[in-house]
């Protein structure tokens, strides 16, 4: 297993039952950017696509957003995100960290215009979920 204190590439996930946002980042520079949005079938991730992305980027760490209520308590999606993190840990030889994602979607919506400042950009495949994954990853990078 790779060292959590590495300076390599890290991958972040914004887990959802319909969509999973994916972002890629660099621990050395503490930067993160949205990568893609994956479709889920009834809450089941597309593991083949996740494996393909993993093989392309070879991240040293996975960071999964932990969806908590505003007061910090868990909600039904929290359990599903934890299960997703456990599955990642079982399927891939890299550490998996969970990171509080409260307000990440709100921040992603604010950042949306950074990526979609005109109609041409609005047709891009990068969606709010991928931007939220980038927000989660950037927050984790800043705290790690």
From Swiss-Prot:
Keyword Cytoplasm tagged: yes
Listed Pfam families: RuvX
Top-level class of the enzyme under EC nomenclature: hydrolase
Membrane-traversing stretches: none
Keyword Cytoplasm (UniProt): yes
GO molecular function: nuclease activity
CDD domains per UniProt: YqgF (cd16964)
Annotated SMART domains: YqgFc
Highest taxon of source: Bacteria
GO process terms (BP): rRNA 5'-end processing
Alphabetical UniProt keywords: Cytoplasm, Hydrolase, Nuclease, Ribosome biogenesis
Protein localization: Cytoplasm
Example of a GO cellular component annotation carried by this entry: cytosol
InterPro entries, A to Z: RNaseH-like_sf, YqgF, YqgF/RNaseH-like_dom, YqgF/RNaseH-like_dom_sf
E.C. code: 3.1.-.-
Protein family according to the UniProt entry: Belongs to the YqgF nuclease family.
Function: Could be a nuclease involved in processing of the 5'-end of pre-16S rRNA.
Family matches, as PANTHER family: POLYNUCLEOTIDYL TRANSFERASE, RIBONUCLEASE H-LIKE SUPERFAMILY PROTEIN
Protein known as: Putative pre-16S rRNA nuclease
Organism: Blochmanniella pennsylvanica (strain BPEN)
């Amino acid at each position: 297993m790779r060292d959590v204190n590495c300076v390599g590439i890290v991958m972040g996930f914004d887990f959802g039952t319909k969509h999973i946002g994916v972002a890629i980042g660099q621990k050395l520079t503490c930067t993160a950017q949205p990568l893609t949005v994956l479709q889920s079938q009834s809450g089941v991730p597309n593991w083949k696509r996740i494996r393909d992305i993993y093989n392309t980027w070879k991240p040293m760490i996975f960071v999964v957003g932990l969806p908590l209520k505003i007061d910090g308590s868990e909600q039904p999606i929290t359990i599903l995100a934890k299960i997703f993190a456990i599955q990642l840990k079982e399927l891939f030889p890299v550490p998996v960290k969970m990171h509080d994602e409260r307000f990440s979607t709100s921040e992603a919506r604010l950042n949306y215009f950074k990526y979609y400042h005109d109609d041409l950009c609005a047709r891009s495949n990068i969606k709010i979920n991928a931007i939220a994954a980038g927000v989660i990853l950037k927050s984790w990078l800043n705290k790690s």
